[in-house]
Amino acid sequence: MNFIYKSFCRTFQFCFRIAMPFLPYRKPTIFTNVKECVPLFQKLNIKSVLLVTDQGIRSAGITKPLEEYLEGNQIKCVVYDSTRANPTVQNVEESKSLYIKNNCQGLIAFGGGSSMDCAKATGALIAYPKKNLAKLKGLLKVWKKLPPLVAIPTTAGTGSEVTVTAVITDSEKKHKYTMNNFTMIPYYAVLDPQVTYSLPPSLTATTGMDALTHAVEAYIGQSTTKETRKLALQATKLIFKNILVAYQDGTNQQARANMLKAAYKAGIAFSKSYVGYIHAVAHSLGGQYNIPHGLANSVLMPIVLEKYGKSVYKKLSELAVAAELCTEETSIEEAAKIFIEEIKKMNIPEKLQGIKEEDIKVMAQHADKEANPLYPVPKLMNAKELEQLYKLVAQDF
């Protein structure tokens, strides 16, 4: 990356950092049991809601108690359960049509990040009935108030219940794009560990590492604040203390609750301090090959951190100490390397299958466009430099 563009990126990031405290960020009201949705909707005088989820969650019966509880209290519950792992424009359009057809007055996002992103984007289309998603993508495009939205995460990973972002895939163009504005934050979030009990160990690992990615990228970037640093450190400690327990015993209520808390804290941290190239590259891989976001982040994280090199050693060492992986007496470089090695021990694949060399250039361009100049990464890279990350993560070459 040439000096002029580097200077532009850093200036853009500095201006955004200065402006951030004056922007209307808000935290959702938190509940700890899904049944608390009923008195909430009664208070809001909502008679009909659209519940956005996926077929796996619904077929497992996880949404059934809430559906029955809502209907038993004269609140109509319409279900959209076709959300894909990387929600598509078509998913959002279908969800919107169902909302309008049934005269719904509010939204419930019940699932992982995909269901929450689909519900957020649905709310944006309801707020802007004459626009399509392409007109609403990018930064600060969605200003109108969305319908009341309750986010119920069934994974402890994305933190989408507290973030300003929805990520949607254009299947035709094989491209993922983000919608970013403060109006996209759900009004309410239910952090109920019981709805995460059935999450299989493999997804517990990858979604938990997704949350760790949020904490790490928020912490190592150049737009941190005292609050986001504190939240990122807390989230990192919670994840390292609880992810193995949750992996081995999915019904351990305390471990599941702590993982939800970690994802929430990391979500706030990266909403205010942003992410980096791990996410940008992961989004492009998800758009091109439909690779689950948590898996892509998990595999990419140690590779990108090693690519950053010495520029992140100090901050990684601080994260390592916070996670009690080493002590303050450990040298900065050694502590940073210990942190990266601990990530590699999380039973995550080292490589991703199916990446084609002929796709790398276009994916790198997408990642470059997403990340630069917005993401305050510790070390700037252009599209050509980002291509190396795809080659490092690819199984087949």
For the regions a language model picked out, list residue spans one by one.
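An N-terminal, well-structured beta->alpha segment
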Residues: M1-V79, Q388, D396-F397
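C-terminal charged capping/lid subdomain of soluble metabolic enzymes
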Residues: N2-C9, A323-F397
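Fold-independent oxyanion-binding glycine-rich loops
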Residues: N33-V34, T53-Q55, T83, F110-G112, ...
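N-terminal small/polar loop signature for handling phosphorylated ligands or for N-terminal nucleophile
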Residues: R58-K130, V245-R256
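Glycine/threonine-rich beta-strand-loop-alpha-helix active-site module
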Residues: Q90-P193
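Carboxylate- and glycine-rich phosphate/diphosphate-binding segment that chelates Mg2+/Mn2+
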Residues: T165-S273, K384
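C-terminal catalytic subdomain
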Residues: S273-S331, I340
